[in-house]
């Protein structure tokens, strides 16, 4: 499985990325070994994930999300929270 994830940084900003294991990737971010963007904004908290079968689909979605505005990402995060389990 391949995942696109969004984390909320300690300063309230959002970071979007790709990972095979998003929970493990968040641990890497929080250890200061993740993306440069998140290293100075720790701790980060996982707030959104999407699952994909192919790496290509996941990377295309990651790029699409990175082009979205913060407001659009917040709406997406809010929708995911309201979905029934």
Where are these regions (language model features)?
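GIY-YIG nuclease catalytic motif and its immediate N-terminal context
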Residues: 1-85
